[in-house]
């Protein structure tokens, strides 16, 4: 069954990456929520897509109490996702101001998954491949996925490498998805969850190609497409 993954929650109808957006995603038929994890200056793991706030301040330079009220802790986000699975994207790109070679966010997220026994409900993804490699080292029972918008090798080579390292899925940008990608993923036992898809016709095309998940800002639209297919 193809899963509906609410991108930053039901982000077309509520402020993204907020408790409100996560709860609404469930009401609109999402199976999963995708959210973004970053850290504050005092080491708290919070949910926010960009490294900076809307006012330009950098999150990693601020303590938790300095953040706006709508920015939630990861713990609160997990509570708000009751009844759904969660794709936690760890934000740790080398070009970002909060890049951390020690992978403190990954370590904290793994600890939280273990503390709450969330292995069956959580998948961790990242654009930075060493991050998901570390997650696998820390806890091989946690599912992991490689996010990508560009590739530097063939789909066959990429899928073979990702599968050999024990990861669960590929998370490609929609514009990359074609039959060659799907064939390579299938050959190596990888799932494919696609981001970010809001057009119902494109959703139907991707379902026909055999994707496993649609990451979307409009989970109600995706649910309608899947129910009609």
Per-region residue spans from a language model:
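An active-site metal/cofactor-coordinating segment within enzyme catalytic domains
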Residues: 4, 31, 37-84, 90-93, ...
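Residues in well-ordered alpha-helical elements
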Residues: 16-19, 65, 75, 220
